[in-house]
Each structure stands twice: as structure tokens, then as C-alpha cells.
Amino acid sequence: MANYTKRMRDLREDRDINQGAIAKVLHTTQSQYSKYELGKRSLPIEHLITLCKLYDVSADYMLGFTDEPKRLPKK
């Protein structure tokens, strides 16, 4: 099972997005977001949902329960 903080960083870096840009989407600071990626602070569920939507991946993938990104179903 992969560490969700590594998945957060990998997904962000794969898309060439900096921490500040993600922090704005989450309505937080770059410093706070950095703490989420480093595992120094727990990621709120609201932020998890937002990141899954942003990256178009399932929560199972983000949390490391699966290695298949499983795109979210379109409504």
C-alpha cells in the first residue's frame, strides 16, 4: 500500500503544478499544503475529495488501496 502523501506529490509533479497553485485550490497556504505532502499534518477529507476531483482519480488510488487510478465516473 502506497503512502498517500507520496501519491499527492507524484500526482502534482506529474502535472507540473507547484504547491502554491494546489494550496489556492484548497483555500489554504503553500506552507500548510507542504505539511500535508510531508505527512506533518493530516489531510482533511474535504481536501482529499477536492484533490481526487482535480486529478481525476479515485480516493482508493489516492490513499494507496489500489495502484489503478480508476478515473471517477462522469455525472
Predicted regions mapped to residue ranges:
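Hydrophobic side chains within well-formed alpha-helices
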Residues: Y4, M8, S58-A59
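Conserved hydrophobic/aromatic packing and binding residues within compact polymer-binding modules
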Residues: M8, I22-A23, Y33-Y36, M62
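Conserved amphipathic alpha-helical interaction elements at protein-protein interfaces in regulatory
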Residues: D10, D14, T28, L54-V57, ...
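Recognition helix of helix-turn-helix/homeodomain-like DNA-binding domains
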Residues: L26-S42
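Short, charged recognition helix plus adjacent turn
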Residues: L63-K75
